[in-house]
């Protein structure tokens, strides 16, 4: 799979990190962590009950072990009893606390090393750590109690709106549930025209294109599953960045949001294929800031113009309702339990919107000849444009050398 490789070459992680608090490793554990635990510890006691201890260690040997307690968490010197031992530097530790790097992002970019334990055992602690820092609760099936309309009644999580519906009702649903489905926004003529443009772009995209994702099917054939920066090949698809209906609905999440027409992969298309056996043609449960960058990119809105039927057979978007307002554990397909899983069935001309940090997924189509196409346009706040230059993505920063020379190959955005 190939994806964006261009960028400014600047050490973005260092520049962005300097805009956030720098945490002294010793002072954080001695003073800040106890204070945070006094504020928010009760939010994590149930989640951490019985979870093995986690330790962080600097290169000079300074080490603190985090242990679950009946009142939250405590940190003690040394690594005795720690099932997981993470080695990192003070800059990376700060970036992790500031959510500029996730546990996954820190390991994948070689900014942290697991001396003991696994990435999963570090990630097991991650929602609780984020909750300590922010006061945001951890996502569980208890969310169903707050997925309510303006009168306090349970939301119909499968509700589809129309262009004639009340904007305040739509805004409330969007902000509470984290997604929105609006039927019939675009005409069949518009959909057909954009579909023709997509096929033109697809014909011009070849394996090795740094702005596209490629997968393999069971015959070994390479198939394109995502094409970024569509304006390279299509003026019409680039001009859609300023399409007023999409802009109006995206701004239900915030009037200051701007379309990312020239960064964060720009206008893009997802193409679902059947029989994908390797690559990112099918995406498990993820968030768009999964390797880091939450305060830089979020709130991030993904606006999807549906060009084909979306359902289990042809491929569809799934979301975990309300999860954008919580810290959350990684999960796999089949582990959703009683969480409010919503499968969005859509038709050509529909518009879907979702927050980038809602848990979402696009599972394999069940039909043998799937071909769903959906155009995506991102919307973000001004801060995102100030930090991320044109032609670049936050992930590019993570996968380029920083001041210490740490670098890794660019990976997918989830």
Residue ranges, per PLM feature:
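Feature captures hydrophobic
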Residues: 2-165
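Catalytic core of non-heme Fe(II) oxygenases with the double-stranded beta-helix
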Residues: 248-255, 278-345, 385-393
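Hydrophobic beta-strand signal
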Residues: 107, 113-114, 181, 353, ...
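Conserved metal-binding segment of the jelly-roll/cupin
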Residues: 346-360
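Non-heme Fe(II)-dependent double-stranded beta-helix
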Residues: 151-176, 183-283, 400, 407-408
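Non-heme Fe(II)/2-oxoglutarate
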Residues: 327, 358-414
């Amino acid at each position: 799979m190939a994806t964006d490789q261009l960028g400014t070459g600047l050490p973005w992680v260092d520049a962005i990190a300097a805009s956030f608090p720098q945490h002294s490793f010793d002072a954080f554990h001695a003073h800040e962590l106890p204070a945070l635990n006094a504020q928010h510890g009760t939010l994590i006691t149930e989640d951490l009950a019985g979870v093995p201890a986690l330790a962080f260690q600097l290169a000079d040997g300074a080490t603190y072990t985090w242990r679950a307690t009946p009142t939250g968490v405590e940190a003690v010197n040394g690594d005795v009893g720690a099932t997981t031992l993470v080695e990192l530097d003070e800059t990376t530790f700060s970036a992790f606390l500031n959510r500029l790097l996730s546990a996954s992002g820190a390991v994948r970019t070689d900014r942290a090393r697991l001396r003991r334990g696994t990435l999963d055992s570090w990630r097991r602690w991650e929602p609780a750590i984020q909750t300590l820092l922010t006061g945001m609760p951890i996502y569980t099936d208890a969310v169903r109690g707050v997925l309510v309309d303006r009168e306090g009644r349970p939301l119909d999580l499968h509700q589809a709106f129309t262009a004639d519906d009340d904007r305040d009702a739509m805004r409330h649903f969007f902000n509470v549930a984290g997604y929105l489905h609006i039927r019939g926004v675009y005409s069949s003529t518009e959909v057909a025209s954009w579909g023709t443009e997509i096929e033109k772009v697809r014909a011009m995209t070849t394996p090795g294109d740094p702005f596209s994702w490629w997968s393999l099917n069971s015959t070994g054939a390479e198939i394109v599953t995502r094409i970024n920066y569509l304006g390279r090949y299509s003026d019409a698809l680039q001009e859609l960045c300023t399409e007023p209906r999409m802009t109006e609905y995206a701004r239900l999440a915030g009037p200051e949001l701007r379309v990312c027409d020239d960064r964060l992969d720009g206008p893009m298309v997802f193409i679902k294929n059947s029989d994908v056996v390797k690559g990112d043609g099918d995406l498990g449960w993820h968030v768009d800031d999964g390797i880091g960058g939450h305060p830089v990119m979020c709130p991030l809105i993904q606006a999807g113009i549906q060009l084909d039927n979306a359902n289990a057979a042809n491929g569809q978007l799934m979301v975990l309702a309300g999860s954008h307002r919580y810290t959350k554990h990684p999960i796999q397909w089949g582990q959703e339990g009683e969480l409010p899983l919503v499968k969005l069935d859509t038709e050509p001309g529909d518009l879907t919107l979702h927050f980038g940090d809602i848990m979402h997924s696009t599972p394999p189509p069940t039909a043998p000849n799937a071909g769903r196409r959906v155009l995506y346009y991102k919307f973000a706040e001004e801060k995102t444009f100030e930090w991320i230059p044109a032609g670049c993505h936050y992930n590019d920063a993570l996968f380029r050398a920083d001041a210490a020379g740490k670098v890794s190959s660019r990976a997918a955005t989830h």
